[in-house]
Amino acid sequence: MAGGVLPLRGLRALCRVLLFLSQFCILSGGEQSQALAQSIKDPGPTRTFTVVPRAAESTEIPPYVMKCPSNGLCSRLPADCIDCTTNFSCTYGKPVTFDCAVKPSVTCVDQDFKSQKNFIINMTCRFCWQLPETDYECTNSTSCMTVSCPRQRYPANCTVRDHVHCLGNRTFPKMLYCNWTGGYKWSTALALSITLGGFGADRFYLGQWREGLGKLFSFGGLGIWTLIDVLLIGVGYVGPADGSLYI
């Protein structure tokens, strides 16, 4: 009986050991899998790399470069292409020389076709607003009356031409006489006044419809108004209603 109990106890002890080992393996495997899952879920701090863009290279072309001929004579460059050291102590109307340098991005040559940056220009001592009218361009006005006594003036903004050199500001205001045309011809107005003046055709042509209606319904003022208009249009006293000049 005792011999049968001992093997039974040994078997139970062996089963307990195997059960303990199996539970230990299960627990240890679960912890490892949980740790692995946690590591996958939370990978920890990550490194971020910031890409610093390269500084954009300036490729803009200055607007004045479009006016500057490439590899031309430096002395013939437009005024917008050069910087000159000027002074206002020169004598008006006398020749004077100034030291000049080309602006950035401008290339020019001397008389020997060698690249040049600094040079001398010759000009007449006078301010830009003292130039002849052929050396600058001014804005035109179509809102003033050209046929008036005394003649009307209007404020204009004038700009010196590119190839002309002068002292002071190259853009300046100036009062100019009204001098614009609306497309009316003096010969046409005179011909209408002679042939169809009794019906007011000359006045209608010039845009003076009120006077035209008066001549039409009065048959040219019985001829008197027609003769007067022929004289007034002939000497240029009667002009277009918009205040412009004849062509």
Curated annotation (Swiss-Prot):
Q: Name one GO biological process term.
A: positive regulation of Notch signaling pathway
Lineage top rank: taxon:
Eukaryota
- What broad class describes the main subcellular location of this protein? membrane
| GO terms for cellular component | plasma membrane
Question: What is the organism field in this record?
Answer: Homo sapiens (Human)
- Name the keywords, alphabetized: Alzheimer disease, Amyloidosis, Glycoprotein, Membrane, Neurodegeneration, Signal, Transmembrane, Transmembrane helix
**Residues that span the membrane, as ranges:** 180-200, 216-236
Query: What name does the UniProt record give this protein?
Result: TM2 domain-containing protein 3
UniProt keyword Secreted, yes or no: no
Return the similarity comment. Answer: Belongs to the TM2 family.
- Task performed by this protein: Probable positive regulator of Notch signaling.
Question: Where, in residue ranges, is this chain on the Extracellular side?
Answer: 30-179, 237-247
